[in-house]
Amino acid sequence: MRREPVGVVGSIAPWNYPLQMAAWKILPAVAAGNTIVLKPAELTPLTSLLFAQAATDAGIPDGVINIVTGTGKEAGEHLVGHPDVAMTSFTGSTAVGKRVAEIATATVKRIHLELGGKAPFVVFDDADLDAAVNGAVAGALINTGQDCTAATRAYVQRPLYEAFVQKTAALMETVRLGDPFAAGTDLGPLISHVQRDRVAAFVDRARAYARVVTGGEAPEGELAKGAYYRPTLVADAAQDSEIVQSELFGPVLVVLPFDSDDEGIALANDTPYGLAASAWSRDVYRANRATREIKAGCVWVNDHIPIISEMPHGGYKASGFGKDMSSYSFEEYTQIKHVMFDNTGVARKDWHRTIFGDR
């Protein structure tokens, strides 16, 4: 058995972690012996260009790492559909991922998709409440919520529900918005005003069927001109509501109660996504059951969102397929060849009787 490079890899990276995502795609592809053409998001192209320049300065030969900037419609679709590209690796929304798969299928190329998420945060009634509250706020607000593994749906067993809502809202209200380069800032702006307005629209529509406990607005004053949005907690939404089912990509956490363990796990699985999840319990057997039954590519216990480079990252269901990081990512960028040598020197093999009989 031999693993060989696939050839030319065409990759498309998102804007939310421009350096990290570029590295996740470039490094395993090149380490496996491929060349790569990377298209960064049009909102964040400079990081990838600087990365490629640093690679050249370090001695990587010209033509191994290539950066192509442009829009998804023009540069991205052309890259995915090009017949000389042997594999496509895409990180981004599920909607765009479906389009990538459609284009790639026309040339029957390999596809690696890391798509959207709607990570559940399941708190059982024996959990450490303070730890869960801190984990929920940090997990929901990481990168201003612009993270496909961010905690977005907190399911809290009913005995802890109201206390969790109150404590989480209180902690969110202590988070300081401001310039990301300022020492006292906890939370910066979203990527753009378009994204801020999209998040705000989700929350505004939710007011008709749910309770906005805290946040739900852009700040006033000196931050009003930026793409800022206050940390937001939404409670009492229905499971089938838009804000529970759709990926927002902003600093918004929705909290819902559940009664039995069966119900909590069922609710956690009840979206199209399956990228990441967390379960909170002092009972290792209870938590381990959750890790088995929650359909997600990563399930943390008593923590949310630690990403470890030695462990694989990738999803189930509409969150895509294939793995980033770890040795599994290396395998994504190779193809398996079966090689067989016959050194017996025998001209007519035993199996040749299927043609020649006993002659």
Residue ranges and their predicted role:
Residues 87, 95-238, 301, 348-349, ...:
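ALDH superfamily catalytic-core signature
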Residues 85, 122, 176, 228-359:
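Conserved C-terminal structural/oligomerization subdomain of aldehyde/semialdehyde dehydrogenase
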Residues 1-131, 258:
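Rossmann-like NAD(P) dinucleotide-binding subdomain of oxidoreductase/dehydrogenase enzymes
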Residues 29, 104, 168, 206-207, ...:
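A generic structural signal for well-ordered alpha-helical segments
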